[in-house]
Amino acid sequence: MKLIRNIFVALAALLFSASLVNAGEKWDMALAYGAGNFHSANATEFAKNVTDKSGGKLTIVTHPGGSLFKGGEIFRAVRTGQVPIGERFMSALGKEDPLLEVDSQPFLATNYGAAMRLYQASKAEIVKGLDSKGLVFLYAVPWPAQGLYS
């Protein structure tokens, strides 16, 4: 049997500080992964959609590859207002809140359907936990199935 770890939410823990959007505002978005990674591609598409749908009132500029903050620094940087928005692999934030690691437990969700059910069951508490830290959860992206790792 192939060991599969299906991280349903790479959280693209897309987090952002709960600040108000001003007309014509530009936000820099910290991304840990390189521009070619699918999480960075999703974030770039998200940023484009925000710019388009806001009529240019908010422009989000993505900064892939840890060019603004390294992966392990993004959560703190958003919380402290050093950057208004950032994307982070959710289970990497387990020291902040153990619930953020729920999707990385081996064999808990072994396919995308099970991962979606786990996401739906845990989302409300994840959102509440991030809110208590002054962050807003925007979207989640499934992480492709992988084997166990340490």
How should these model regions be labeled?
Residues 15-23:
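Sec/Tat signal peptide C-region and signal peptidase I cleavage site
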Residues 55-58, 74-88:
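Alpha-to-beta junction loops
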Residues 36-61, 121:
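Short, polar/charged alpha-helical segment
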Residues 47-48, 89-150:
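Contiguous mixed-secondary-structure segments that line small-molecule binding/active-site clefts
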Residues 63-76, 143:
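Short helix-initiation/N-cap motifs at beta->coil->alpha
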